[in-house]
Amino acid sequence: MNSREKGKRGERRWRDMLREAGFQKAHRGVQYAGGTDSPDVACPELPGIHFEVKAVEALNIWRAMDQSIRNAGVRKTPVVAHTRNRSGWLVTMRADDWLTLIRQSDHVAATESPNADSLPFATTPTPAPSP
């Protein structure tokens, strides 16, 4: 199988994963144009995300992220969804974007720290291990 076919197959697998997660309108993007209107996979339910999809054994994640950043433009969050043979999917994004996303989620625990407002996100102290 050539790399173009492998790429298409990876894009279809990522699209299917999004659909299984409830994002039923996910579809492969327009591949001939490049740029913000042509992510590898588009998902109308996640309008602020630009997906670049990579299905390769040895991924240069920096190059893939650069492509996603360049193609995402200023209004979308660049995300690289990547996998390799016999492996699950990984998602790579910039730390600032991840922190923004996690702050908006229900994964942030309340804290009693008086300086909680100065933290980029709330934290819960980890209990000391038992002897």
Give each language-model segment a name.
Residues 1-131:
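Catalytic phosphate/metal-binding cores of nucleic-acid and nucleotide-processing enzymes, i.e., regions
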